[in-house]
Amino acid sequence: MAGPPALPPPETAAAATTAAAASSSAASPHYQEWILDTIDSLRSRKARPDLERICRMVRRRHGPEPERTRAELEKLIQQRAVLRVSYKGSISYRNAARVQPPRRGATPPAPPRVPRGGPAAPPPTPAPPPAPVAAPTRAPRAAAATAPPSPGPAQPGPRAQRAAPLAAPPPAPAAPPAAAPPAGPRRAPPPAVAAREPPAPPQQQQPPPPQPQPPPEGGAARAGGPARPVSLREVVRYLGGSGGASGRLTRGRVQGLLEEEAARGRLERTRLGALALPRGDRPGRAPPAASARAARSKRGGEERVFEKEEEDEDEDEEEEEEDNVSEGSEVPESDRPAGAQHHQINGERGPQSAKERVKEWSPCGPYQGQDEGRGPAPGSCTRQVFPMTAVNKEGGSACVGAAPDSPSPVPLPPGKPALPGADGTPFGCPPGRKEKPTDPVEWTVMDVVEYFTEAGFPEQATAFQEQEIDGKSLLLMQRTDVLTGLSIRLGPALKIYEHHIKVLQQGHFEDDDPDGLLG
């Protein structure tokens, strides 16, 4: 007859009880890995890792029931390997190792509990005491770094190990701030570096102040910088006038004043009929190539930087003519530096009364009519923007003998017809050549074709001929008509439209407000 079963020794029973308790309170390594991988996977897909999703995904991947997964998850939460987060009324779980570490000044995280063995728990004492005074402050963090991690939730350990090396080096060079938390010595150097760096930029910014120059003298434009628009009052003030105290300044008055100065010899006429300062009074020059590039780079009412001092050089003759004609026609006289006196003023070489000058509109050249540089009438200024630019693009001037078949007078906006001379031709133009009507309303289809050919659009001009567009039709064309009504590609059509509208706008604006285009 068998006796009662033998009881295990008391020591063995105690050890078994301790092991059972430890195994019940610690999560299984497999479950810990599965749960943490599931949380990371859900978060990488921007899915909220709540309890239901975690249990379902662990079951699908590895097979355990949701109850077991829930129990293992609770153990991981107790071990601080997983964090429970409540956000907007819903509870989700995060991998503690992937959560942002706490701020450096905050209290260090508690080291993970190690349930398996009592002897492995007391690592804070073996931490070697460093020589600096700041050792007590970092003792808990160093202890956390040296503590052996548990099988699963060892994540706080690496954070402490990352923080400890960052905080350890600073106390060696500076002993006084070592008593502060580790963040103190670490954050101190950047402000010091920042304090050393700011003085450098002010030294770099010191050179610009001596650069400003008086705008009326046109020094900035001569030096190659952007030209500042000049008002009529500045022009009159430079010439020694009253600055328009007697009434409103108009371009006609300023033009008359400039012509009087030219008659006195204070201003001189260039080869192309423009007014300029005597050569001895002009500021420094820019090279001819630079002036040509500057004149070409800006079009349509912008301030120009161009030079006329090199007009006597034969090799640059054609280039100078193009630049001067285009500048004289496109840019209002008030948009150029007054000191340089590069206002393309109407007139001829020699004294002439202001009333006679008002009547003259012809853009003829200096070789035959001495009037190439003549721009618009005093009250209208830049009325020949579009046509003169068109002539320039063809590489010649309106009445220069180099191109005998080029149509000379350039069309003007409606309502501003040129006053003919005694022989029926515009002033200054040589007779003997059939002239295109100066009023676009009177243009024929061939005049329109010729007009766009001179403007640099010979291929597109045929489209206007095919559609039989005369002057009246051209003036009535809208934007959509130019862009879609003709067999012209969009790019050239846009250029043609902008070219065309530029002239109309300037004509209307100057009729309403003579000073409307001043800078």
Curated annotation (Swiss-Prot):
- Phylogenetic lineage: Eukaryota, Metazoa, Chordata, Craniata, Vertebrata
Composition-biased stretches, type Acidic residues, lie in 308-325
Please name the InterPro entries in this protein's record. Answer: SAM (IPR001660), SAM/pointed_sf (IPR013761), SAMD1-like_SHD (IPR056983), SAMD1-like_WH (IPR048589)
Quaternary structure note: Homopolymerize into a closed pentameric ring. Interacts (via SAM domain) with L3MBTL3 (via SAM domain); the interaction mediates L3MBTL3 binding to chromatin. Interacts (via WH domain) with KDM1A; the interaction modulates KDM1A function.
Entry keyword annotation includes 4Fe-4S:
no
Induction per the UniProt record: Expression is inhibited by miRNA MIR378C. Expression is induced by PDGF.
Q: Tell me what this protein is called.
A: Sterile alpha motif domain-containing protein 1
Q: Where is this region: Disordered?
A: 1-30, 87-232, 261-381, 417-439
> What GO terms describe the biological role, i.e. biological process, of this protein?
chromatin organization; foam cell differentiation; lipoprotein lipid oxidation; negative regulation of transcription by RNA polymerase II; negative regulation of transcription initiation-coupled chromatin remodeling; protein homooligomerization
